[in-house]
């Protein structure tokens, strides 16, 4: 619909996960990966010569768990982890202060429906099940982080979530690094993302003559927009459709 399948052999397809190819769920561990999506992703990887990668805020281990048996090249943890096509993994060597993580976790103690997710390199406070507490959660996250003035901290607001991480890495810096390695090098990246946390990746696309597509929200400079994750899944299926499948 948006990209001619004939361009796939010269493209690199980069996909955010939650809210982009998977529907959002009440909690991070409740997301559902349709079996047909895993099959389509495997085909898409072959169509692109292996130049298909996840670009996610989730830890690498979770991506592997949800999409098994696939182990695609991946940018995980908002750029803290980078797995290349040959399986090698580079990881950031900076971590959040343990006391900061503990204080952030305590935000949920008196807030039913608020879920704290420790992602190793970041902490996410989800309020999807308690949207009325969104303002309180955001205010408390800011207050907690203000108690650690000597610590480099980045606060990322998202869809019913606030994430706290080190500012030394993000999806954009990781995409830039990924594009230096085979089979991504020299290809035109196609990135699809849905949230504020994806904007760093959108920002580096012009460096590689890339194109970006958002899901459910307008983003400056993008080439187009999908309404919802099911539309992205449908697009992926169409990109890998063979003549035999069409019969």
Spans of model-derived segments:
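Non-catalytic pre-domain segments flanking phosphatase-related domains
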Residues: 1-17, 21-25, 29, 36, ...
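Mg2+-dependent phosphoryl-transfer enzymes with acidic/Ser/Thr/Gly-rich catalytic loops
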Residues: 8, 34, 172-247
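The start of beta-strands in P-loop NTPase/AAA+ ATPase cores
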Residues: 11-13, 18, 51, 72, ...
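Residue-level signal for inorganic ion chemistry
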Residues: 19, 74, 125, 175, ...
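Active-site phosphate-binding/coordination module
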Residues: 32-119
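Substrate-recognition/cap helix-loop segment adjacent to the acidic, metal-dependent catalytic center
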Residues: 58-77, 133-153
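Substrate-recognition "cap/lid" segment bordering the active-site pocket of phosphatases
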Residues: 77-103, 156-186
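Charged, glycine-interspersed solvent-exposed loop segments at helix/strand-loop junctions
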Residues: 114-132, 152-165
